[in-house]
Amino acid sequence: PAHIVQEQVVGPTLGAESIAAGFNAIALSFLAIFVLMLVYYSTSGWVACISLTLNLMFTMGVLSALHATLTLPGIAGLVLGIGMAVDAHVLIFERIKEELALGKSHKQAIIDGYKRSNAPVLDGHIAQLITAAILFSFGLGPVLGFATTQLLSITISLFCGILVSRLIKEIYTASGKRHFKYFTPVSKAVFQKAHFDFMSMRKVSYIVSAVILIGGIGSLVNGFDYGVEFSGGRSYTI
């Protein structure tokens, strides 16, 4: 026999507001990331911006082709996928900068930079894919929607981050007469010779870590306040 696991009714006004809020979150995320990448990585930031745009377009296209339902948790999964895609580009660009610092040509630095950054990029994405796969296998309702978009977004992020961005860079620098820049006046002035003495703050870190640990132990002892998803009942949004 069929059993209703979850039932949710959303009025048209709340639904429209939720959709608008979700897409506004995606737009603001993109805007903040674009500005950050351009300010920090100069013209190389444009490659990351193009790759991120393609990532979102491909993800939405696959969701549409699969006739998947886009939910608010699904939008959250998209935003998380954008973050993972940015992380991949940061790892790659920083590795290329290290290769350039060794005196290599821009063309060779791109080849070696992508080759030597593959392992950390794959590690991060595979860890997220495993988590998303577990949520997809055992999750229901909103959790399933989140896991679906997260799986797609992270998988496509690998394709765009490792293949598409590399293709753009290699085509642009193939002649050896032009290349992308990886520094701006701001990033040079603030970060190129930055030195942060984190060890001097270790005592403060010990105290903060101890407080967080005690709070975590306390939450386990006292238990959690479960929502209607776990305890059952009704929830009203007015």
Range-by-range predicted roles:
Residues 1-10, 17-18, 22:
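Extracytoplasmic
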Residues 16-71, 137-141, 200:
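Interfacial segments of transmembrane alpha-helices in multi-pass membrane proteins
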Residues 46-67, 78-85, 146-161:
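Small-residue-enriched core segments of transmembrane alpha-helices in multipass membrane transport
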Residues 65-69, 131-148, 220-223:
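Transmembrane helix-loop junctions at the membrane interface of multipass transporters and ion channels
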Residues 81-101, 121, 158-164:
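Short helical (or helix-break) motifs at transmembrane helix termini and adjacent helical loops
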Residues 100-126:
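Helix-loop junctions and hydrophobic alpha-helical segments within the transmembrane domains
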Residues 163-216:
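Interfacial helix-loop-helix hairpins and adjacent transmembrane helices
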Residues 211, 216-238:
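Juxtamembrane segments of multi-pass membrane proteins
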